[in-house]
Amino acid sequence: MTSERSRIPCLSAAAAEGTGKKQQEGRAMATLDRKVPSPEAFLGKPWSSWIDAAKLHCSDNVDLEEAGKEGGKSREVMRLNKEDMHLFGHYPAHDDFYLVVCSACNQVVKPQVFQSHCGRKQDKRNEGIFRNGPEDIQAIEKKQM
């Protein structure tokens, strides 16, 4: 379901007021104060083309990219490590999200980590068997069932 606003490439504060949007005590959201093209209009294109079209620059004429490097903690975007790509996917905001339930422990995990989850559980079970000795194997197997 897409809202009317997401289908419109540019929407100013005046247009938002016309659709029934209220401003909170005279303050408008930053996105409503200026015309910014919708990122959906630039689907498949590099982000630099959207930045150029939006002309997003800081107040002191420093590029947005440079400001992000300097004010790392003030950013609203969290960067993910490349090593974690197998966990989060290539495009986490757009990828389908699935969860699976482990039948052994009823823990809910993402499919990407399910195999490693099962491996850890299996390792812990094997450690318990070897610690207790072969005479306790049948008792442990009965507990697991």
Swiss-Prot record:
This is Ataxin-7-like protein 1. The gene is ATXN7L1. Residues 1-31 are annotated as: Disordered. It comes from Bos taurus (Bovine).
